[in-house]
């Protein structure tokens, strides 16, 4: 059986998301969940960047940019959504983020009426 990439860190991040959901519940805008996650990341002394801009280049020319919700410990991209389910465009989005950032692991978490759902995406 193969070992998960950044297993301990990813489970800590997922635990934070569940903690925030358990305290806030469902029904808020994504930005409020993100702000609560910032508080919890700080409590856990995790190094993170929020709304990280990643530029996309072609032949040394800037052709676009992405804004990642979180990069945690310079290892994991965390993308948070408030939605009913996972959508294909969300998966494509986080894969693009991983490719552009050069990071190996992304966590796509969605906040639903029924709770938290998440996927670990490996680049």
Where are these regions (language model features)?
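Solvent-exposed, charged helical/coil patches
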Residues: 1-45, 105, 116, 122-123
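Conserved catalytic cores of phosphodiester-cleaving nucleases, focusing on short active-site segments
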Residues: 25, 70-84, 97
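A short acidic/basic microdomain associated with nuclease active sites
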Residues: 44-60
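Well-ordered beta-strand positions
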Residues: 49, 69-71, 110
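Structural motif
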Residues: 58, 63, 72-73
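Structural motif corresponding to alpha-helix initiation and N-cap regions
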Residues: 64-65, 91
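Nucleic-acid nuclease catalytic cores
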Residues: 81-123
